[in-house]
C-alpha cells in the first residue's frame, strides 16, 4: 500500500477525516440528516463517510466546510484527538452545568471508538485490499 507524508496510510488518512467530520458534526449539534440536506446527498452517504466505507472527495469536503463554515485546514495533517483537546480546553473555561459540550464530547469519543473498531474492516472490504497492508 502506498504511504503518504508522515507515514500515514490511505486508511489512516480516511479514518482521521471521518473522525474530524464526526467531531465537527456532533460538536455543532448536527445530525447526519442535516449535513446530508446541506449537501443534497442521502444521510446514508454521510454515514458511509463517517464509517470509512466511502472515501470523501476533496470537492465534497470543501463543500461541507464552506456550507458549515468549518476550517478545512483542520482536516489536513491533524490528529482528531489534538483538535478535540483544544475544544475541551475552551469548554473547561465554561460553566459545565449550562453547557451541552460535556455530553457532546462523550458522544464524539463513543463514535470514534466505533470508527476504530469497524472502520478498518469497512475500508479494506470496500476498497478490496487485504487486511494488514
What residue spans do the PLM features occupy?
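A short, Lys/Arg-rich alpha-helix, primarily the initiator
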Residues: 2-27
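Short basic helix-loop element that most often maps to the first helix and adjoining turn
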Residues: 19-34, 63, 95
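Residue-level detection of the helix-turn-helix DNA-binding "recognition helix"
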Residues: 26, 40, 51-53, 80
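Short alpha-helical DNA-recognition segment
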Residues: 28-48
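Short, basic-rich loop-to-helix N-cap that marks the start of a DNA-contacting helix
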Residues: 53-66
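Short, charged recognition helix plus adjacent turn
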Residues: 76-114
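C-terminal regulatory/oligomerization modules of transcriptional regulators
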Residues: 110-133
Amino acid at each position: 500500500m502506498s504511504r503518504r507524508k508522515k507515514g500515514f496510510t490511505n486508511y489512516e488518512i480516511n479514518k482521521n477525516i471521518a473522525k474530524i467530520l464526526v467531531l465537527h458534526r456532533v460538536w455543532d449539534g448536527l445530525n447526519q440528516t442535516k449535513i446530508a440536506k446541506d449537501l443534497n446527498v442521502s444521510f446514508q452517504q454521510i454515514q458511509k463517510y463517517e464509517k470509512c466505507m466511502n472515501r470523501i472527495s476533496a470537492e465534497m469536503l470543501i463543500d461541507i466546510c464552506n456550507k458549515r463554515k468549518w476550517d478545512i485546514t483542520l482536516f489536513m495533517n491533524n490528529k482528531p484527538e489534538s483538535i478535540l483537546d483544544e475544544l475541551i480546553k475552551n469548554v473547561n473555561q465554561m460553566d459545565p452545568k449550562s453547557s451541552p459540550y460535556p455530553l457532546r464530547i462523550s458522544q464524539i469519543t463513543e463514535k470514534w471508538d466505533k470508527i476504530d473498531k469497524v472502520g478498518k474492516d469497512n475500508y479494506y472490504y470496500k476498497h478490496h485490499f487485504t487486511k494488514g497492508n
